[in-house]
Structure formats: C-alpha cells, structure tokens
Amino acid sequence: MFALADINSFYASCEKVFRPDLRNEPVIVLSNNDGCVIARSPEAKALGIRMGQPWFQVRQMRLEKKIHVFSSNYALYHSMSQRVMAVLESLSPAVEAYSIDEMFIDLRGVNRCISPEVFGHQLREQVKSWTGLTMGVGIAPTKTLAKSAQWATKQWPQFSGVVALTAENRNRILKLLGLQPVGEVWGVGRRLTEKLNALGINTALQLAQANTAFIRKNFSVILERTVRELNGESCISLEEAPPAKQQIVCSRSFGERITDKDAMHQAVVQYAERAAEKLRGERQYCRQVTTFVRTSPFAVKEPCYSNAAVEKLSLPTQDSRDIIAAACRALNHVWREGYRYMKAGVMLADFTPSGIAQPGLFDEIQPRKNSEKLMKTLDELNQSGKGKVWFAGRGTAPEWQMKREMLSPSYTTQWTEIPIASF
C-alpha cells in the first residue's frame, strides 16, 4: 500500500502559517520577478484568479478584493517542506519526496496494525499540529492509484481530506476512475490525452479497461505500466533515495535588463557559486561547465540573441573557484555588446562521484591543495543562511537581482526574522 500526501495550496499556505490574521483571507504568491500568479489560496481561487495570470492584471483587483500578495520565498517553502518530511518520516516506515509539496509513503506492514484510512487521518492531524499546514492523503495499492485517490480528496470533501482505495471498497475505485478525466491520471500529459480521446478513452476507468498489448504497441511501455497500476498491479516502487542528478542548472531572469558586461559577470559568478554549492550537496564532481545568455523573445522591437558556451575541465572538480573561473571563460565566448539581456545561467554536467583523475604531464591546471576542506568550511559558514560568505566577483546588492518587492520574512531560516510570540 502507498499513500500520497499533498499539501493544499502549498506556497500560499506557508505564508498563512506565520500570519494568523490571513486566515480565511485571499492570498496569492507570485513567480520570479513578481511576474505571474503561481499559487492561490482557496479564497483567491473563489475570486476567479487564474494560475499563471499576470500580476499587472491582478494588481487592479488587489485593493478592491483585499487580496494579500507575496513574492516567492523559496527559503521558507523549502524549510516548511523539510518539516513536513520530518513529521512523515517519524510516523512512517519509508517516505519519498516526490516534489516540494508531495510525498509518497510506503504503508507496508502499517495496514496490519491499523486501518489505512485511520492512519491517513493520523498523518494529516500530526502534520497540521506540528507545522500548521493542511494536506490531503490518497491511499491505494499502487502509486498511480494513490495519485488518483489524492485527486479525489479535492473532489470529495465529505472524506475530510483522506481517500483510501482498498480491495474492500472496489466500488469506490470504479466510481473514482469513472469520474476522473484521463488527462488527470498520473503520467498522462496533454498530447497523450488528445491521442487517447481520439480513441474514445476519456476517463481513467476507460484507460484501465484498455488492452495492455494494444497500449504497449500503439503508445509505450510507460503507458502500459500506468494501465497496470490503475488495475492494482504495483509497477513503480518507492524511491527513498533520489537518483543521482545528471546535470545542475542555476539560472534566473533579471529584475532589470543587463547591458553591461561587468554586471553580467557578477550574475554568472553568483550562479556558478550556487551551482557549485548544489554540486557539493550531491557529493559529485563535474568536468563540464556551460554558461548561457539570452535576450527576451517577447521584446519584438529589440534585437534578439541567445548563445551558450561549454568549458571542459581537465580534472573533475567541486571547487567553487574552478567552476566560477570556467563559467567566466565561457561568458567571454558568448558575450556580445548591444543587447539587453534578460536571463543567464550556468549548467554543470559530466559528473563523477570522485575527484580523482590522472593529471597530464603538461596540464596547466593541477589539483588544488586542501580544496575539499576549504569548500566544506565555506558551506558550513553558509549553512544557517545562504550568502554569509561569498566570492567578491558577484558584487554587492546588484540592480539586476530578481525582483521580490513583496517578500515575506524568512521565519524559519534567519535568526533575525524569527516571529515574536505575544501572549
């Protein structure tokens, strides 16, 4: 048995946890540079605010409808996600972090001691008590069915946030799959939905009843696996440890367009520094660094330019100094004057779990002495808050930094911003 825990309106809910005055108030969270709506509380949804709606359209409604608006506070959301994970891990045999607001839980053995539905309510109540966040829980014999059950928690409020699909309630499974559009099935995207609809497969139940050999021949083994999962055959196991990453990308759209190379150099240094930090977090070394820059594709009255350059490293490294230097060399290859750049980024690839390699006799770059100790010290200094110690090349408070004009405090990651309790 599997359970899928999904935090309701996660970003908006995190903002409400530390602001009790916002209870039952409409709250929205904006994307990078305060561009568009990426999260809505139920009250905001009721006002007709759409996911992805541009901020300038919502701005007109803000005062009239008394909507509370926040810029994305990723440090807060990540911290709250980790807290939810910690609660679930303390109560469950094994947990897989599927996304920042979704976690799969292995219930093997649990159902012998307690009803899955009762256990789901216990999980829900404990998370609410310890974090202040409300979640829905879908329980089923496969991960795909658990996803469908979780979808049902939002459609069937009478179940109080927990829907269990077990062998004892087969009729509930059939009813749910008959109501769920095939496009809502886990792993079925828009294009696949169109093809299935053309064949008369419009619901999850119709997909479950499809011939597996036909699905495999005309679609893929992956969709065949989905069909088997919908029929209660578990084909997808729990991933307690995420698979090793093949690449790491760190990029942002700029708050202000960049036209000066020095400013672009600062941005690339910052992105390379962050990418190197992530690389060390993965306990990997890289042998390839890519820097890319681009103008806005929507600025039709401005010249358009996009380019990327790759730097190969003779020795695998996780040292920020090597990665920053390589990223800046790549920038020199792609930089062109006369453009208004809106985005840049650094990508690391060609990973190896070890930095050991045989240097060539005539290699200009030799292994750095005490590199790992220095990087470990740097990461420990920055552990309680990113950016305590940084490389001078990234500058201080640059104008191109991402706009977050309505950013909430970092309640859980900065000592100076911990909320004060009053009695």
Regions found by a protein language model. Name each.
Residues N111-I114, W156, V300, T352-P359:
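Short, charged/polar, Gly/Pro-enriched secondary-structure boundary elements
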Residues M1-R228, S237, I365-F423:
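Gly/Gly-Pro- and Ser/Thr-rich, intrinsically disordered tail segments characteristic of DNA damage-repair
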